[in-house]
């Protein structure tokens, strides 16, 4: 499935200008049909999955309780 720059911006929660600049820099693969750029949606699948995994990992770390009895010997 192909998306326009506007649809890609909505899908990725990024601005249209930023998406367009990434396309023009060649950082996002796109096809130009004469009128608009068309971007293959599946190229973002792995990235978005990794982003969700990272968010879950960060949340897990933040929710981990701090031990009540920290056995630290201060030798100062």
Swiss-Prot record:
InterPro entries: HTH_17, SinI_DNA-bd, Tn1545/Tn916_Xis. One of its GO terms (molecular function) is DNA binding. Transmembrane segments: none annotated. It comes from the Bacteria. This is Uncharacterized protein YoeD.
